[in-house]
Amino acid sequence: MTECFLPPASSPSEHRRAEHGGGLARTPSSEEISPTKFPGLYRTGEPLPPHDILHEPPDIVSEDEKDHGKKKGKFKKKEKRTEGYAAFQEDSSGDEAESPSKIKRSKGIHVFKKPSFSKKKEKDFKIKEKPKEEKHKEDKHKEKKSKDLTAADVVKQWKEKKKKKKPTPEPESLPVDIPRLRPVFGIPLIEAAERTMIYDGIRLPLVFRECIDFIEQHGMKCEGIYRVSGIKSKVDELKAAYDREESPNLEDYEPYTVASLLKQYLRELPENVLTKDLMPRFEEACGKTTEGERLQECQRLLKELPECNFCLTSWLVVHMDHVIEQELETKMNIQNISIVLSPTVQISNRVLYVFFTHVQELFGGVQIKRVIKPLRWSNMATMPALPETQETIKEEIRRQEFLLNCLHRELQAGVKDLSKEERLWEVQRILTALKRKLREAKRQDCETKIAQEIASLSKEDVSKEEMTENEEEVLNILLAQENEILTEQEELVAMEQYLRRQIATEKEEIDRLRAEISEIQSRQQHGRSETEEYSSESESESEDEEELQYILEDLQRQNEELEIKNTHLNQAIHEEREAIIELRVQLRLLQKQRVKSEQLQEEEELGKQNVPSQLPRDNLPETKAPKDQPKALMEQMKPSPIKKTGKKLSSETLI
């Protein structure tokens, strides 16, 4: 059988060849009439027309056709790249047999694309092929480098790889004392009151008192207080601060936020404020017919409440009564307050109505006291503003001593917290400063009283006896002050001499350490010069430089922390020394007073003994005195050895 082919569209080169009559006519290959180039020639899914080997012309090609074939092959390559066609199966044309590289390239692409292939896609396709070429170039570059390497370089690379593979020991982190979270919200009322109670002894949690105090000052003119909710993120921030046992500054927040915080605290109480046992009895009492019976029963039940529960209930009702009194500005009456407060504290509206309408009868003696926070001294560079009068100083000392006892109790219980230890030192510093200020205030008050007395005495006409008595009192006070100042001056001079000796020894130690440092630096410079000469031999020893650098940085950081601790300790030692000087002055004054009192007693005893000797002989009884009586009198006249030893002991204590 013979096969028939449709005449393909002749190319310009074939047309010229036909005109000149050069070469033999050849049959078209399967590639030239493939369905990809002529999509309308064959149906989709039909196989290509078979090639019969018998009908193929002989492989006799002229030199012109060979040149033309090469040009055509190049043209086909460009055409494939630009058009982006892909063969569905292998072609068995004569051209592909001559150039097997074409078959390999056609196998790599198995995607049929549209005939229209833009330049942009062609660029993208070329960019995708670039990384392979770059990798090939890098591999060649590495091979060249590996050929050029010497033995020393290979050893160096091996050491670096080994060092990278070695697991570097992670630095041991310093133990950090993480403070335990001791929440205030959600715990029983008694526990919260005992933990956060302040110096005045009112058994209420600090968060409750501070919130009420802030709203009493800043929230009485806010419309819809306790009804309008605050910002939730701010409320959560305040709650977290109180759970960390901090005292945030409520001045930075709105009254609505603080009111929402108070409601949240009351809502999270694990037990009802009126207790589970008494709550139904309160309901029964408020449901009675007559008002007198209701009041009498409520008063009796309120006395049965625990101390913390009664205190919280009374403060809450009195505070809400203050809010109701400002109804014109707050827009909150009894009904609104009851609607807001009833689901929060889980008390019915009927009970709350009885409480709010009979505040004076049920909670008449309750007064809301302001919270005064203890003084802080966080910045060592500045001195805090201490109170001026003696009463305020004493009150602040009571606050600080109460806080100091609480901190000591918590630290002795095993709570490890660096912030509490720092607060302990801070409270001790404040206490020493307050006590010093109190002594100065007492001295100033005494001086002012003396000046006032002198002024009043100069103006008034008084007798000489009164003047002498007052002058004696004034002189005694002045002498006592003078003695105190002199003894204090002596102690300060002794302390100054001791500190000067210590400074001299410290300077000598500094000079010695500087000499050692200079010697070590000279050794290091000498060692560096030697290592530079033999650097090729000591490459292995320089591997640990990074570790040494890290150790040095760690030591420097530890040194900074120790310096901070040292400054705190020095400050505390200085304050303790001042306290010791004051105690020594007081001891010396007491010893002097004791010596004076003993001398006065001796003089009185001698005076009593001399009185009977001056009486007339007639009045004396006719009894013979013993022979040893003069000796006994002489022994009484002599100072006792106990007094001498007492004086010696006082001098030894001063030394």
UniProtKB/Swiss-Prot annotation:
Spans annotated as Nuclear localization signal: 102-119
EC numbers: 7.6.2.2, 7.6.2.3
Main location (coarse class): membrane
Biased composition (Basic residues): 69-79, 102-118
Region (Required to maintain nuclear localization) residue spans: 494-510
GO MF entries: ABC-type glutathione S-conjugate transporter activity; ABC-type xenobiotic transporter activity; ATP binding; GTPase activator activity; small GTPase binding
Signal peptide (residue range): none
2 X 5 AA tandem repeats of E-[D/E]-K-H-K: region residues: 133-142
Site (Arginine finger): 227
Segments of this protein annotated with the region Mediates interaction with REPS1 and REPS2: 496-655
Membrane topology, record value: Peripheral membrane protein
Sequence repeat coordinates: 133-137, 138-142
Entry's Gene Ontology cellular component terms: cytosol; lamellipodium; membrane; mitochondrion; nucleus; plasma membrane; spindle pole
Keywords: ATP-binding, Cell membrane, Cell projection, Cytoplasm, Cytoskeleton, Developmental protein, GTPase activation, Membrane, Mitochondrion, Nucleotide-binding, Nucleus, Repeat, Translocase
Catalytic activity: an S-substituted glutathione(in) + ATP + H2O = an S-substituted glutathione(out) + ADP + phosphate + H(+); ATP + H2O + xenobioticSide 1 = ADP + phosphate + xenobioticSide 2; leukotriene C4(in) + ATP + H2O = leukotriene C4(out) + ADP + phosphate + H(+)
Localization: Cell membrane; Cytoplasm, Cytosol; Cytoplasm, Cytoskeleton, Spindle pole; Nucleus
InterPro entries: RALBP1, RalBP1-like_Ral-bd, Rho_GTPase_activation_prot, RhoGAP_dom
Compositionally biased residues, Basic and acidic residues: 52-68, 119-150, 619-630
UniProt region (Mediates interaction with RALA and RALB), positions on chain: 398-495
Subunit-structure text: Interacts with the active, GTP-bound form of ralB and ralA.
Role noted for this protein: Multifunctional protein that functions as a downstream effector of ralA and ralB. As a GTPase-activating protein/GAP can inactivate CDC42 and RAC1 by stimulating their GTPase activity. As part of the Ral signaling pathway, may also regulate ligand-dependent EGF and insulin receptors-mediated endocytosis. During mitosis, may act as a scaffold protein in the phosphorylation of EPSIN/EPN1 by the mitotic kinase cyclin B-CDK1, preventing endocytosis during that phase of the cell cycle. During mitosis, also controls mitochondrial fission as an effector of ralA. Could also function as a primary ATP-dependent active transporter for glutathione conjugates of electrophiles. May also actively catalyze the efflux of a wide range of substrates including xenobiotics like doxorubicin (DOX) contributing to cell multidrug resistance.
Domains: entry comment: The Rho-GAP domain mediates the GTPase activator activity toward CDC42.
PANTHER family given in the database record: RALA BINDING PROTEIN 1 RALBP1, RALA-BINDING PROTEIN 1
Protein's name according to its UniProt entry: RalA-binding protein 1-A
Gene: ralbp1-a
